[in-house]
């Protein structure tokens, strides 16, 4: 299947509406295997070989709802796009959102070497990717003989599945979060085991009576496991309810374009079955050990001690201690990981950008086919737009860029320096801008001068370099006056017209400060800025700095565009630059990790405190008689407090030590799976201090109760 994408505009209304159009070969419907909701899809007769395509259009579901109010009588109506009428022949279902398009039009494939297509493929059943790669590589080699400039010798085919394309970007993060969920599950199950063991130990007399009356060990185990499973099922039901409510929130936190538009992320039947099965399995697994331990009571000892409060015994205390230590260790690991993720995200938030995104926005304006086909006409159109927008009272300044809107600027290309050899593999980023661009983004000039408006409009062969390039190639500060050449600056009309001789030598007239040009984390690359008339594009951005919140000015900006050309639309998705930054893959991904890890860590901390509180409360209850005897013999409250804290000190201390070792051992994995995360010793020490404080707080209330015991009451305690 072949496809192309373009931005069109409706021309049957007062104000033009931006429409994202995907042109498809007529086999698209069968290729994707998705039948239309209404009418039909594209068919071969819509784009006959050697002829212009038929004026038919298939609507996306969202455009059908937005533009036609989901009217089922839409078939046969006419939609005018850029003054051309198209007959509506179909509407696609909600799940089909290929290209996030509004409309689908028949595509006419051409042999024009300037046209490029990225056709999605569907492999035949039984054909491996390796076999398909080999077959396609042979085909590419044949193409290279006809158009060698499009297919250099190093060109290789590497098929990638659609799911792989998305999993590649987010897969490591999902595995990391799955690991965090697993840790939280183990911590929760450990907590349940502690509670079951404590409750079961308190029931040893009851269980011994049952055994003495003939209850077999298997029956006692079944009873205890049933109680454990009741907790698991109740917890699973509550968890599923919370998941149904929380999944939409988590999807909102996901980085934009993390999944295909067609992906339906919801709690479906497989997820439900997995959750219930996991709940039952953990209920059996973590309830089995306490059940087996409690199903072998010492009948003689227990019955003889029936008039006294039962104690857990050495083995029971050891199991309690191990469970508490494991819970503390895993909680420390999760808290340390969360601290590292949060620190990495905070560092990313405070990354020096080199430009000021506050109160600035980018307004994208697509040029229609067969309009402004020369560089003079196109530059005059955009300069008129820029001047009108800059004159608005809410606007501080406005500039033009065809490919340099932060946070990802420019395109990489080979270059030459006059009198200085440059390795073939070296590249720089080329940015096409107007002189006002630097004023709008507050990028300072460090040396020399900017090119001015007159030089831009006549296509003067001038260039500015960033600080990184100046230091790399002219470390002594001699960049001004040097000459540089970018061979690919040559125009390709009518889509990319350019000023005459744009691919000739350019003179460097200034050095500007570095600005991040490849996302938020990648180091700044060598870059040049040239007048945007050196190579015009079909999509151009007007960068606007405002005195107020930028999006409140958007209506006025649209009115200015309409005043210059009533048929010209503004692209639908307009954001201020701060919003563009927060939709970047690394920003949204680290935010997701930090938020979820933080939430999991807080839950783990609460579970650990609850588990430790339960253990200490149980110990105090079991040793009430002992504490009464000690106090009757003269022991003070401080002595009793010390005994209570000492009863858990070994378990907590061992858990902290194990958690520190685990955290430091696994910090490399965290850094690899969550880029930017930093779990250094300071974070681990802070978490240790936090857990020590939490453990102390968990022990305070039971310890206070123990130290406040009336010796006479304690001696009578059963």
What are these regions (language model features)?
Residues 6, 20-46, 53-175, 248, ...:
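Mid-to-C-terminal secondary-structure elements
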Residues 193, 229-302, 340-343, 646-708:
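Small-residue-rich transmembrane alpha-helices
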Residues 521, 560, 566-657, 671-672:
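C-terminal transmembrane helical bundles of large multi-pass transporters
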